[in-house]
């Protein structure tokens, strides 16, 4: 998967799309490119990888923040892995009656650049009623405390949803939900 992600980045025409992904302001969410990314293989850049005029400050391979959001359907390598019977069995084993793949991403943790991703719940961004969104995270390289591994709050999935990322006209906005006791 890592080799395939590197190949996709190498083949990506960075001149065609220079959308910066930022977990801080979510300004990327207003772009048509982001809004259509659910049905595509789309590339998003790190904030520090481009200057104010959109020129690259880093090598293309070190400028990518993430690739998303339909790798599982549109790329044969990711599709073979994502649609593997083991994932379906795992999903059913944790109680999913009808597991569906809705989104896939490669999140690149670039050295020395990259914004902090605040604590969040995946259902903030992929909401279902009832709340049944479950994310599977696969490390494509060693993840340690020193290099910024993902953290999880034990039992956090039982605490109730705190925020939702919802459509707002042509873009998106974050709303805070009622406090959960």
Which role does the model predict for each range below?
Residues 111, 128-130, 162:
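Short, function-defining helix-loop hinge/capping sites that tune catalysis or transport
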Residues 103-105, 110, 121-123, 138-142, ...:
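Short, structured patches in soluble enzyme cores that scaffold and shape functional sites
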Residues 21-27, 129-130, 176-177:
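Short alpha-helical linear motifs
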Residues 1-117:
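Non-heme Fe(II)-dependent double-stranded beta-helix
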Residues 91, 95, 120, 126-145:
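Short, conserved beta-strand element in jelly-roll/cupin
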Residues 143-181:
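Double-stranded beta-helix
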Residues 100, 119, 125, 132, ...:
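Catalytic-core "active-site belt" of small-molecule-metabolizing enzymes
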